[in-house]
C-alpha cells in the first residue's frame, strides 16, 4: 500500500485583500512549518518524493519543514479565491467581505458561483477539478510514500473526489483545514 500525505501551508497573511498580499507566511507560519518538519522527520519519514505548489507560502512551508530537495508542481496551487471574489463583486453577485469572519459564508457562495459558471476567475471550475484529480492520480503510487505541500482548497477537493461529495460538502471540508495540518490518503493497488 502507498500513501499520499497532504500538508496545508503554514499561516499566511489572513488580513490580505489580494492573492499577492496573502501569499507569504507570517512569523507563526514559519514556526509552524519548522515544528511540523521536526515532527515528521522524527516520527513519519522518510518519503519517496516531496512535492510543493509554486506559491510562495507553499515553498516557504516545505523548505521550513526541512525538505530542501522537492519538486515544484503548480497543480498543487490554491484556488485563486481573491480573484474569484473580485469577479463576484464586479458582477454584483455578492457583497464585499468586511472581515475575515465573513469567509465562512462567502467561501461556499463563491465556490457555488464558480461551479455554476457565473464566474471564471483565472481558471474554470472544471479545469480546477481536473488539475487536482491529475496531481492526486500521479501521486497515487502503490508502495510509495509521497508528501505534497499544498493548500486547503486542494486538500478539500481531493477528499471530496475520493468521497464523491458535492461542492457544498467540499466547502464544509475546506473551512476547518488548519495551517500545517496533515491529511493522509492510502493508495491501494
Label the predicted regions.
Residues 16-19, 63, 81-86, 160-161:
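Short aromatic-enriched loop/helix-cap "lid" or pocket-rim segments at secondary-structure transitions
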Residues 166-188:
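Domain-level recognition of soluble alpha/beta enzyme cores
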Residues 4, 144-150:
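Generic beta-sheet signal
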Residues 152-156:
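GST superfamily/GST-like fold recognition
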Residues 66-131:
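Phosphate-handling substructures
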Residues 52-53, 130, 149-150:
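Short beta-strand scaffold positions
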Residues 2-73, 126:
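Active-site-proximal alpha-helix that buttresses catalytic centers in soluble enzyme cores
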Residues 43-46, 139-144:
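Glycine-rich phosphate-binding loop signature in dinucleotide/nucleotide-binding domains
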